[in-house]
Amino acid sequence: MIQFVLMDIEGTTTSVSFVFDVLFPYFRDNIQSIASRAEEPEIAAILKQVQDLALTETGTSLDQTGAIATLHQWSVEDRKVAPLKAMQGFLWEEGYKNGDFRGHVYPDVLPKLKEWQKEGIQLGIYSSGSVKAQKLLFGYSDYGDLTGYFDYFFDLKVGQKRDVQSYQAIAQAVQLPPEAILFLSDVPAELDAAIQAGYQAWQLVRPGTTASPTHQQVTDFGAITSLH
């Protein structure tokens, strides 16, 4: 019996276009604004992480301007690195709170969250976006604050989403056997890693998603039948 449903965000609970057409451009349009605030502790810590990672990866020593430019470039490349995700979360928080945008959630998601919560099934998010960014998206969603439906939020601190060890670590964190966990994602490689860890895993085939012939599929949350 499934006791925990773990969900991806982009392409699963949320439209890919919201991320690529709203969130990413907002970040790139506003990244230069942090130059005048580089002494703020949170910003300074993230820039230091950028400098450390650049030094490790390329041997390049970056000044503040170079670190900001690198964040912009990483965003263009959609790099899955922690400093970028942290800075995105920082700037997106301001956008959400200013009402510049609201977090997109597919209309079929909330009814299922309510149903699962009522049945006593625990719910969690696992995304490459930082936990902060995850909570902002669901906290300022089209349907209001949905964060109360989720028991856990996981990001890249637990590991990369295509690594089996990441899903093993999540199972340990929620203190459940892997076979009691259902993972929902649109990405076959992520589903494969979860399955190798012992999870059940289904592919969400949203508009624009290529269906995988090797995975169980649903087109929306409403198509997910009883988990008992």
Curated annotation (Swiss-Prot):
Which residue ranges does UniProt annotate as crossing the membrane?
A: none
Q: Which CDD domains match?
A: HAD_EP
Q: Name one Pfam family in it.
A: Hydrolase
GO BP terms, alphabetized = L-methionine salvage from methylthioadenosine
Q: Does the keyword Metal-binding apply?
A: yes
The record, for InterPro entries, names: Enolase-ppase_E1, HAD-like_sf, HAD-SF_hydro_IA, HAD_sf
User: What does the cofactor field's note say?
Assistant: Binds 1 Mg(2+) ion per subunit.
Annotated EC = 3.1.3.77
Gene Ontology molecular-function annotations: 2,3-diketo-5-methylthiopentyl-1-phosphate enolase activity; 2-hydroxy-3-keto-5-methylthiopentenyl-1-phosphate phosphatase activity; acireductone synthase activity; magnesium ion binding
**What is its pathway?**
Amino-acid biosynthesis; L-methionine biosynthesis via salvage pathway; L-methionine from S-methyl-5-thio-alpha-D-ribose 1-phosphate: step 3/6; Amino-acid biosynthesis; L-methionine biosynthesis via salvage pathway; L-methionine from S-methyl-5-thio-alpha-D-ribose 1-phosphate: step 4/6
Family matches, as SUPFAM superfamilies: HAD-like
Q: Which cofactor does it need?
A: Mg(2+)
Provide the catalytic activity annotation: 5-methylsulfanyl-2,3-dioxopentyl phosphate + H2O = 1,2-dihydroxy-5-(methylsulfanyl)pent-1-en-3-one + phosphate
Q: Which UniProt keywords apply?
A: Amino-acid biosynthesis, Hydrolase, Magnesium, Metal-binding, Methionine biosynthesis
Q: What does this protein do?
A: Bifunctional enzyme that catalyzes the enolization of 2,3-diketo-5-methylthiopentyl-1-phosphate (DK-MTP-1-P) into the intermediate 2-hydroxy-3-keto-5-methylthiopentenyl-1-phosphate (HK-MTPenyl-1-P), which is then dephosphorylated to form the acireductone 1,2-dihydroxy-3-keto-5-methylthiopentene (DHK-MTPene).
- Name the protein family: Belongs to the HAD-like hydrolase superfamily. MasA/MtnC family.
What's the subunit arrangement here?
Answer: Monomer.
- Please identify the protein, giving its name as recorded: Enolase-phosphatase E1
Q: Which organism is it from?
A: Picosynechococcus sp. (strain ATCC 27264 / PCC 7002 / PR-6) (Agmenellum quadruplicatum)
Q: Which gene encodes it?
A: mtnC
